Amino acid sequence: MVIATYFDQATGELVRPLNETTRRQYVEGAVAYVEAYEPRYIGFGIEINSFKMKSPDEYEEFVGFFRELYPLLKEASPDTKVFTVFQLERIKGLHGGLFGGTNDESLSQWGLLDDFPDADALAFTTYPCLVLKDPSEMPEDYYWEIRSHTSKEVFITESGWFREGPEGWESDDEEQASFIHTLFDLTEDLEPPLLIWSFLYDPDVQIPFDTMGLLDANEAHTRAWEAWTGT
């Protein structure tokens, strides 16, 4: 699986302007790649609904870019499945918690899925710990709700739960492992071909993502690792 993007979804900033020259370079590079390697899956854009919140005009340009690129990729490698990636919590209208807003289903963004009718699949990142304090708060249809809005194949390309959170959002390794069990249970009926935990080891990034690894730098075995691997 390969996922490529030309913007920072957190800031809405482009890596470089999407002018005629860079657009052509992106298209030619992507087509050349799938011709050469025929990947099973290739994605373009990461958390594009978050990108839209920051840069709505550039989001519309991305929608057009995806529509232009899709048939060229399928012509070059017909069996490659082409997709884009959404941020699930924001799609659901969950903007509260560590996002700093409010959880309000009326703010859901499910309609954005319709901007990509050609996509072979739709992918999501999911970090419920940013909006909920315990995995037990996740309703039974937390992931199955996706099926109410698309019949396409569904991928989970990022997932995570932190072991250490800011004040008021404390967690531990037991809670992290509990989320993994919940994630498996609540996605079972979706049968996602891809279900990915974001970090094997704790990354050197901002709180709270810095303790989302299945392992820290000095560990070879944790409750989260046991839950993920079934060992």
Where are each of the predicted segments found?
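Surface-exposed amphipathic alpha-helices with a cationic face
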Residues: 63-81, 86-88, 143-151
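Surface-exposed cleft-lining segments at the edges of enzyme active sites
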Residues: 15-18, 48-59, 92-95, 124-136, ...
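Aromatic-rich peripheral "rim/lid" segments of glycoside hydrolase catalytic domains that contact
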Residues: 12-15, 166-179, 186-231
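Aromatic-lined carbohydrate-binding surfaces of glycoside hydrolases
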Residues: 1-13, 46-50
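Catalytic-core region of carbohydrate-active enzymes that cleave or remodel glycosidic bonds
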Residues: 133-193
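Aromatic- and acid-rich polysaccharide-binding/catalytic face
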Residues: 30, 37-40, 44-46, 84-86, ...
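An active-site-proximal structural segment forming one wall of the substrate-binding cleft
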Residues: 13-44, 58-75, 103-118, 177-190
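Active-site groove signature of glycoside hydrolases
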Residues: 28-59, 83-88, 193-202
